[in-house]
A protein has these predicted regions:
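Segments of small-molecule ligand-sensing domains
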Residues: 130-182
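Pocket-lining segment of extracytoplasmic ligand-binding domains
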Residues: 9, 41, 46-146
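Generic hydrophobic/packing signal
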Residues: 4, 23, 28-31, 44, ...
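Bilobed "Venus flytrap"/periplasmic-binding protein-like clamshell domains
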Residues: 2-67, 161-165
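Short intrinsically disordered coil segments
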Residues: 18-22, 109-113, 154-156
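Proteins with a high burden of low-complexity, intrinsically disordered sequence enriched in S/T/G/P/A and R
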Residues: 1-5, 15, 110, 115-120, ...
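Short glycine-/acidic-enriched loop or helix-start segments at secondary-structure transitions
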Residues: 34, 84-85, 150
Length: 182
């Protein structure tokens, strides 16, 4: 999941966010605030190095970016909002992550990792092969949720993988083994 900036901004890496207006807080999506902090840490940046723009969620992050109230936005590849922002501002660019910064990021969010992406229809804003910050989505249930219900959910996702990928191409990496981690 990348951080996007205007294509004509001159920014190419997370380090270029220093002094910029960066969406933070994500009061309705608390995990995204931690993800943003971890991504900043890959470039040795903290909240003190940027101008925080508080938002409740990723949609508002994109809206503030399009309205020129923020210099970046955070959103998953494949989301219609990404294409909307791309068209609205005349082009966007995904910022590259420096792998050398991952130890600092893992101090904030231990389960983050890098994914290789390349230009393509599903990867709006990617101009060249690069690494982006990734994290797994988590399905949380209550302790009494039957195991067979979770199995059926994952099996349904495996059986309809082609449909899922058609809607969200990054899910091409999904597998039953990848989808279950205790």
């Amino acid at each position: 999941t990348p951080i996007f900036v205007r294509k004509d901004s001159g920014m190419r890496t997370i380090a270029d966010l220093k002094g910029k207006r960066v969406t933070m807080g994500y009061s309705a999506m608390r995990n995204i605030d931690q993800v943003t902090r971890a991504m900043l840490a890959t470039a040795r940046l903290t909240e003190a190095d940027i101008k925080p723009v508080l938002v409740p969620n990723v949609v508002r992050s994109a809206d503030d970016f399009v309205a020129s109230n923020a210099d970046m936005f955070f959103f998953a590849f494949g989301g219609p909002k990404v294409r909307e922002a791309d068209v609205s501002v005349g082009g966007i660019r995904a910022l590259e992550i420096d792998p050398a910064g991952m130890p600092a990021a893992r101090k904030i969010m231990a389960w983050g990792y890098l994914t290789d992406v390349a230009p393509g229809p599903a990867f709006t804003g990617v101009e060249k092969p690069m690494k982006i910050y990734s994290f797994d989505n988590v399905l949380i249930t209550h302790a009494k949720a039957p195991d067979d219900l979770i199995y059926k959910l994952l099996d349904s996702m495996v059986q309809t993988k082609a449909d899922l990928v058609a809607i969200a191409p990054p899910l091409q990496e999904f597998s039953a083994a990848f989808g279950y981690r205790a």
